């Protein structure tokens, strides 16, 4: 069997790669190829998965659904010609007997259906949580957005219901249950976004009779997530630093350790240069939960800050709270059962529209404030309510699922494509 994976975005590429790597481990694994519809597909290249067609980085970075001006930039940048060439290639793949895995939204799903090949769909972009939760419809979404009875529109469900569509893998249990009501081949196997965060061999945990006292005096660890796009991430960083200042002012009686996870594609000097009033240190703080010799450490009264580009997972696992202006990273942090504070930026990705939608997707785990200066009091309010922290922990796991989804999807995919 031959399998072509279509994906349309950096995050989608990463999810696709996790599934394909698990497929490779299975007996009778298919011959695998990829075609990223947006961007250059570096995740595939890094995983040594061949890319079989034309790729190109677009000006929008894949956020054309957020802004019509971004779409026009992409059209001028060659989007239409690229899309036509990719569509022809997918059709040729189908004529040669290959199957297709579509990862993302309606674009790769449409490509897969129009090819005539057998296909499966991993729906990363949509969730019923945008419209409802387990208790019912959200009041603000019952109108136009929920008119068809699902976050997936009738034409999207039509594409999932064709006889060549062998399986649909939604991102959460709620979405799966709704799609099953429309007699679609939906499987609740989890969200691959949560795979690969925990170490393959966890560190041993030893009993410490002084653990309670240590917990009282240890620093509060706050993860800083400015996003991964230039120049938006640098603009977001300026807002995040206002929140950092606010926290240091309001938490004067407790030390705070800020962990800034900066994407490797960004210039760290731009973030370093903004730390006015911070003194650079020669070594990482003792409480820093990372092992990165390239990380930069800074301090000022009441706080410490670490800039790292090589310890993303360790930062996620080690932090208590996150100040986040990101997409995938925010969802992963929530999936660990931890609280997020967010405030809107100027975009094009993390604007108010995106941030508000994210709060619907992730529920109680994300608190959206209007300005950075509201961050400290929000954190204090959450810390003062243990029941709320417990609710946040349960909510995150429910909405994002447990690790191991990629392997479960891979096994089901191979089974359904072989029938």
Regions found by a protein language model. Give the residues of each.
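Nucleotide-activated sugar donor-binding and catalytic core shared by glycosyltransferases
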Residues: 1-419
